């Protein structure tokens, strides 16, 4: 299993804004620095007294009720104005002028309202903060090391290191950087934040950053009712302590906040849009690149004739890509560089497995060695699994079995350079945080970058991006065999982590994935990502400074005349029916890349977000939210995980799985129901997370997944009631979850290799007898309205979306000639062909209704096929399955209540509760 998670809140993007709504105060004491990992809504230090830091991490933040005593009915002192005529309180003086007068808001409202849109926030400054650091700075010196003493820091004035966290419904949506040693900090920091929260108040929590945690200084609350009209609230507020009293006489926070609802945000009203003015996803690190080419892949290989032909709108037939075949030939044809990033890279994997192809016996390691001997620069940037070791030649495989040490050893005496890259928290983080990040999180990107022929004796950059690692267990075709290829295509490549012990005669775990190839300017952004990561990972640290530096391994392509630069890269005219516009997104932070601004004040200029001691690119989350909000007809998702929007669950609201994606989908459907318009969401996930389904971690993930489903179906049911449609339609007429599975009969070749007796009452024995197993959905992709596609390495959970956990990369792309806005009807371009090809793979049929996925007829047809396949899968009778798409084994009643499917409370053969169990395991391992 690749993905567990720790429970940190998420941080949205903040596109730049030219000027703050009010001037900065004339004074500022203290130097600026950003420090520490992501913030967790820490209360005073006494709150943590009962926690053993060596055996469990501290809680992320207290529940919302923690703040109730000092946020709900406190008399909030306020000065300033509401930016709409006839509303609010005004001050004729500048918010910072000596003549400013304080006007109380009165009792704060507790009315809960839905904030669905964007918040435009400025946090300007604080004044007269209390000094909380005299005691805790001393502790920081003792526990944080003696370097401060060496540098003479103790001679400086010791006072608070303040920052501000902004939260809605208990979910942190933004935070300022830390300003060291200042009682009058000036941030002038802008936030442009997507929200999809039911909330009564917006909290601005002022904290003091310490080496051993954070202390609560005080809080300012803004009632949602005050901003719901869209008026801008702007002013200076008294900072209150936990008793509702000023934390210090004269302690204030200056801010402004404005809410814009979805119906006023035109960028979300017309999908991709038409014309030259569409700028892609705003507020991201990499821009939209026009005039590229994209190839979309399903599975590692699609043999000729395995899938039916699909007619496109231009009269052409959709061409099914052969991912690993194309990767193999791209490597073979490289002349200058081959760069690979991976969660896992195995030198012994075979990319080509067609019997008639002479390359079928070539191993990846041999190919890369051969290319490096030709003078090609071959660099591998692979996650360093901390549980694998190579000590004095003795290697341990590691818990994840990534082959990292094995692959490094294979290339040891070659010119191929392998850099094993641990997931580091950064030296300015606490020791606890460094251990936490290094042990739990991973480098999860999967890329291949090569130079390719550009004509005229010139070279260009081509990149492959998606979910497929170049390692064992990944090669598969749309047939997803269980037993029949164990002695052929999968000989020496058996992978099924569900089983422990003897696996003789057991089914392999079929692997379904999505990938892409990018040819054009956006490929250079993938190269930039590799270069930024390599330079950061290659930088020597501490004792490693004695080792060889990898800094000079990267090719300087600007000094190689025959490689075209990004501005010179060949492009396709936007009028060409096959043109693509492509944008690269990431989840990554400044601890994993070199090139982010050193001063957090400049984060906004790069569309980065501030965390404690870290700058964050979380543009994958931004891209998903933008695409879902802009969807007009349907959403099709395949993903390895589906967990999020925990702030709106019916329990465990505070675990920190705060990404917006599930809630945005549910609210999109609810909006369409109220508008009496059709909309459908299809979500394909694995039957269970990879591993043992009865295990504590797996059960906890399934439990969170169930909570996510329940929240979404509940939101949809409420919308049906509001529209008076609850008797006519059910929630599953709009949203459905599916999984994939296969079942094979024994053929005459006795391909199964029966092994030990098949009547043993173990998962192995039961699977040998039933000849069935799930197809593992490892995909990380989304299709919206057949006009926009997202494919990458990021799962839909907190660790992939947050930016400070796993490092991720994705591409978002569309064809400008194949959009709803241009055609005024359903697009029939490559994205349409890709989605139809995936459905043909999963259902073994192409129905006429599939061309309109939003239609009720299509939704019910797909659900019927999936229900029939599930019944065939769970039956005692062994039969050959043609289609693989199955109903996820839960029952959703007309009121949106989600329960295990009767008779299928546990997964067939392998056990484990379908809706999971709340077992005693740290939730930060599973979100």
UniProtKB/Swiss-Prot annotation:
UniProt record, GO biological process: lipid catabolic process; phosphatidylcholine metabolic process
Keyword flag Lipid metabolism: yes
Pfam families in alphabetical order: C2 (PF00168), PLD_C (PF12357), PLDc (PF00614)
Membrane topology category: Peripheral membrane protein
Cellular compartments annotated: Cytoplasm; Membrane
InterPro entries recorded: C2_dom, C2_domain_sf, PLipase_D/transphosphatidylase, PLipase_D_C, PLipase_D_fam, PLipase_D_pln
Family, similarity comment: Belongs to the phospholipase D family. C2-PLD subfamily.
Name of the protein in its database record: Phospholipase D beta 2
Organism whose genome encodes this protein: Arabidopsis thaliana
Lineage: Eukaryota, Viridiplantae, Streptophyta, Embryophyta, Tracheophyta
GN (gene name): PLDBETA2
């Amino acid at each position: 299993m690749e993905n567990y998670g720790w429970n940190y809140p998420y941080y949205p993007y903040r596109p730049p804004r030219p000027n703050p709504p009010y001037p900065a105060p004339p004074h500022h004491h203290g130097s600026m620095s950003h420090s520490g990992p992501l913030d967790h809504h820490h209360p005073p230090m006494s709150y943590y007294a009962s926690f053993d830091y060596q055996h469990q991490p501290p809680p992320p933040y207290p529940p919302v009720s923690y703040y109730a005593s000092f946020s709900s009915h406190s008399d909030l002192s306020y000065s300033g104005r509401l930016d709409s005529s006839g509303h609010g309180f005004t001050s004729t003086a500048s918010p910072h002028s000596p003549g400013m007068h304080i006007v109380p808001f009165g009792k704060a409202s507790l009315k809960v309202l839905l904030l669905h849109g964007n918040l435009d926030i400025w946090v300007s400054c604080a004044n007269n903060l209390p000094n909380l650091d005299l005691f805790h700075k001393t502790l920081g010196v003792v526990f944080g090391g003696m370097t401060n003493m060496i540098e003479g820091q103790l001679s400086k004035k010791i006072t608070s290191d303040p920052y501000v966290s902004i939260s809605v419904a208990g979910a942190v949506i933004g935070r300022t950087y830390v300003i060291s040693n200042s009682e009058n900090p000036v941030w002038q920091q802008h936030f442009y934040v997507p929200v999809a929260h039911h909330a009564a108040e917006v909290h601005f929590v002022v904290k003091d950053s310490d080496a051993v945690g954070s202390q609560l200084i005080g809080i300012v609350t803004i009632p949602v009712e005050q901003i719901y009209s869209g008026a801008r609230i702007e002013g200076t507020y008294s900072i209150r302590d936990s008793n509702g009293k000023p934390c210090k006489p004269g302690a204030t926070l200056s801010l402004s906040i404005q809410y814009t609802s979805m119906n006023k945000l035109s960028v979300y009203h017309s999908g991709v849009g038409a014309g030259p003015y569409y700028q892609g996803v705003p507020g991201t690190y990499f821009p939209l690149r026009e005039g590229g080419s994209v190839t979309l892949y399903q599975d590692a290989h699609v043999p000729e004739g395995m899938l039916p032909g699909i007619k496109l709108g231009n009269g052409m037939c959709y061409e099914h890509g052969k991912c690993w075949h194309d990767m193999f030939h791209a490597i073979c044809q490289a002349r200058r560089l081959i760069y690979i990033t991976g969660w896992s890279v195995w030198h012994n994997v075979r990319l080509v497995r067609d019997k008639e192809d002479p390359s079928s016996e070539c191993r990846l390691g041999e190919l890369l060695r051969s290319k490096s001997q030709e003078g090609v620069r071959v660099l591998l940037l692979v996650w360093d699994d901390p549980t694998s070791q190579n000590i004095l030649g003795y290697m341990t495989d590691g818990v994840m079995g990534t082959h990292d040490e094995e692959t490094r050893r294979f290339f040891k005496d070659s010119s191929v350079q392998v850099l094993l890259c641990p997931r580091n928290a950064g030296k300015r983080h606490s020791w606890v945080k460094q251990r936490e990040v290094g042990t739990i999180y991973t480098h999860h990107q999967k890329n291949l970058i090569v130079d390719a022929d550009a004509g005229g004796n010139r070279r260009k950059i081509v990149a492959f991006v998606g979910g497929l690692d170049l390692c064992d267990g990944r090669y598969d075709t749309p047939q997803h065999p269980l037993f029949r290829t164990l002695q052929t295509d999968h000989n020496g490549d058996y992978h099924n982590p569900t089983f422990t012990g003897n696996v003789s005669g057991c089914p392999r775990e079929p692997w379904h994935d999505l990938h892409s190839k990018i040819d054009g300017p956006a490929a250079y952004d993938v190269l930039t990502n590799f270069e930024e990561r390599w330079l950061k990972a290659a930088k020597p640290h501490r004792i490693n400074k004695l080792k060889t530096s990898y800094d000079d391994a990267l090719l300087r392509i600007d000094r190689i005349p025959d490689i075209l630069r990004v501005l010179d890269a060949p492009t396709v005219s936007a009028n060409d029916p096959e043109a693509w516009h492509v944008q690269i997104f990431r989840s990554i932070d400044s601890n994993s890349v070199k090139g982010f601004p050193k001063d957090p004040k400049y984060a906004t200029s790069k569309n980065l977000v501030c965390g404690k001691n870290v700058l964050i690119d979380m543009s994958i989350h931004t891209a998903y939210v933008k695409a879902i909000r802009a969807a007009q007809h349907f959403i099709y998702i395949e993903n390895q995980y589906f967990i999020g929007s925990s702030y709106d669950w019916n329990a465990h609201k505070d675990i920190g799985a705060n990404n917006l994606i599930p809630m945005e989908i549910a609210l999109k459907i609810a909006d369409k129901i109220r508008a009496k318009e059709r909309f459908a969401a299809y979500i394909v996930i694995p039957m269970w997370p990879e591993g043992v389904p009865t295990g504590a971690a797996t059960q906890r993930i399934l439990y969170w997944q169930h909570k996510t489903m329940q929240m979404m179906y509940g939101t949809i049911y409420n919308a049906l009631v509001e529209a008076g449609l609850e008797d006519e339609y059910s929630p599953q007429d709009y949203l459905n979850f599916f999984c994939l599975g296969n079942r094979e009969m024994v053929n005459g070749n006795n391909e199964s290799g029966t092994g030990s007796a098949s009547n043993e009452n173990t998962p192995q024995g039961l699977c040998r007898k039933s000849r069935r197993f799930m197809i593992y959905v490892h995909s990380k992709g989304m299709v919206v309205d057949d006009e926009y596609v997202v494919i990458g390495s990021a799962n839909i959970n907190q660790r992939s979306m947050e930016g400070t956990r796993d490092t991720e990369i994705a591409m978002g792309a569309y064809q400008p000639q194949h959009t709803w806005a241009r055609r005024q009807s359903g697009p029939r371009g490559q994205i349409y062909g890709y989605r139809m090809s995936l459905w043909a793979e999963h259902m073994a049929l192409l129905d006429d209704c599939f061309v309109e996925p939003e239609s009720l007829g299509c939704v019910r047809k797909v659900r019927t096929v999936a229900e029939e396949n599930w019944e065939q899968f769970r039956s005692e009778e062994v039969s050959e399955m043609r289609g693989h798409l199955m109903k996820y084994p839960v029952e959703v009643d007309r009121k949106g209540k989600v329960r295990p499917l009767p008779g299928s409370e546990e997964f067939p053969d392998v056990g484990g509760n379908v809706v999971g169990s709340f077992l005693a395991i740290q939730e930060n391992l599973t979100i």
